[in-house]
Amino acid sequence: MALLNSNCPDLKLVARGKVRDLYEVDEKSLLFVATDRISAFDVIMKNSIPGKGKILTEISLFWFDLLKDVLPNHLITANFDEMPEKVQKYREQLEGRSILVKKMRVVPIEAIVRGYITGSGWSEYKKKGTICDIPLPNGLVESEKLPEVLFTPSTKAEIGDHDENIHPSKMVEILGDKKLADQIAQSAIALYTKASEYAASKGIIIADTKFEFGLDEDNNLVLVDEVLTPDSSRFWPANKYEAGRTQDSFDKQFLRNYLESINFDKNTSIELPQDVIENTLSKYKEAFQLLTGREVNL
């Protein structure tokens, strides 16, 4: 059963994001619910991808476990039997797509890491020879592996607004804390490096990804939100990779390409056709199976 919007009247709804609904459980914990909503170009589509939220949740849990030695994360439990009673009453709606997490002070930055030149980075490079105003060598081609992994942050926009790519020095201004900014950049690159090495062993190139961070009560940096999912990353099949062109992918790129092909108005939500829904879901399933070695159980 698809879930477009969760409905938990006995829990305090804190926010509805592009994909996740966020509830306060008590003064120290939150419930993250991954719905089946899908967005592209910062626009939420009118219909959903059934089961997508469960796949995203399972992939995030997989990465939280794999990367926990690089940086702690905000997870308390994803086992529904361990959730508080007031959450368990919504089992039918929420099980398999919810995680109970510690409350954190969220850092207002999208921590984007790029190993390959594609997407908005490729667009900027063609115009200016830079990504986030960071100069790059001449002569790079689309989808080429970058000379070194780049940390290219963006602002964290409100729903309906667009994230803005910024130079890392601008992040220092926004945070007002150079030490924290440096730690975020170093942690994001370390997380990406470990994840991309693992994914490569499974035949997947992680071209780029987006991390989000929070601070705990002792000001320790913590990994939060979703991690290395097909919503937040570009996953390419390694056996089909060829620099100089757009790549096949196991992620939202299929949807982005469809929307571009119909000259999508990036200010207006639309209803997606069934074949686009099915193709998008199959790509998410394939990413899950390749990364985890498990079958999807929707």
What are these regions (language model features)?
Residues 29, 106-108, 203-206, 218-221:
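Coil-to-beta-strand transition motifs
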Residues 175-207:
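A long amphipathic alpha-helix within ATP-dependent nucleotide-binding catalytic cores
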Residues 1-157, 266-271, 275-298:
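Active-site loop/lid in soluble adenylation, ligation, and acyl-transfer enzymes
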Residues 127-131, 136-180, 223, 227-291:
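Anionic ligand-binding catalytic core segments
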Residues 113, 206-227:
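Conserved metal-phosphate-binding beta-hairpin within the catalytic cores
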Residues 69-74, 194-206, 219, 292-298:
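Surface-exposed helix-capping loop/turn segments at secondary-structure junctions
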Residues 41, 122-123, 218, 232-234:
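Intrinsically disordered, low-complexity acidic/polar segments
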